[in-house]
Amino acid sequence: MKGVILAGGNGSRLMPLTKAVNKHLLPVGPYPMIYWSIMKLQEAGIKDILLISQKEHMPQFYKLLGNGEELGVTITYQVQPAASGISDGLSYAKRFTKKESFILLLGDNIFEDSLKPYTERFEQQGKGAKVLLKEVDDPERFGIAEIDEKNKRIRSIIEKPEQPPTNLCVTGIYMYDAEVFSYIEQISPSKRGELEITDVNNLYIENSQLTYDVLSGWWVDAGTHESLYLASQLVHQALRKGQDEK
């Protein structure tokens, strides 16, 4: 299985920190944010990684990461001309993934769990897609999943619902088969002019092919000043705990 990391966008919610640097290069604990996605993939045995971002950010990423050798992976770079949505960014991974299944990470998602058990279950699934969910206290802020717990399927995904059916938000951790690229071709830009990943996931739902797992550890979308600070706190706590257990 290959890995794809989306690391684009202008990081407007993290201004002025992102005025001169891509948000995925900001520190989270002792490392740049982008390291965490790469290390999670590497720990799960996924070492062939595509990093997607805008052209102006690529020199910074390449200076930091090079070909990935220092982190035990192989990194390929792909330009997304404009930050036009997750599905648009993902569409540029088609040549890299070929006809293989793969895992997609949003580079600002910092989380505790190992990816390995989830990727193994997805490989056993054989086809379709899987998303990882997380219980949250403020479901009105997220895309929320209505689930069929018996069959481990997602019935629907509702963006920022006023009356959430559950408190299970869709995180930025997705697994797809090669069919995803034909689904991307079928969707249209949203009101904000972007190709939304929820529209792609809904096509999988229509075919009863979107499964889920729920993260057991902590998870943070580190896209704001508050959540970036929280992610650093949680990372430092986890590192201290690991040192204490040695």
Curated annotation (Swiss-Prot):
Mg(2+) binds at residues 108, 221. Pathway: Spore coat biogenesis; spore coat polysaccharide biosynthesis. CDD domains: G1P_TT_short. Its cofactor is Mg(2+). Its EC number is 2.7.7.24. GO terms for biological process: biosynthetic process. SUPFAM superfamilies: Nucleotide-diphospho-sugar transferases (SSF53448). It catalyses: dTTP + alpha-D-glucose 1-phosphate + H(+) = dTDP-alpha-D-glucose + diphosphate. The keyword Magnesium applies. Keywords: Magnesium, Metal-binding, Nucleotidyltransferase, Transferase. InterPro entries: G1P_thy_trans_s (IPR005907), NTP_transferase_dom (IPR005835), Nucleotide-diphossugar_trans (IPR029044). It comes from the Bacteria. PANTHER family: GLUCOSE-1-PHOSPHATE THYMIDYLYLTRANSFERASE, GLUCOSE-1-PHOSPHATE THYMIDYLYLTRANSFERASE 1. Catalyzes the formation of dTDP-glucose, from dTTP and glucose 1-phosphate, as well as its pyrophosphorolysis. Belongs to the glucose-1-phosphate thymidylyltransferase family. This is Glucose-1-phosphate thymidylyltransferase.
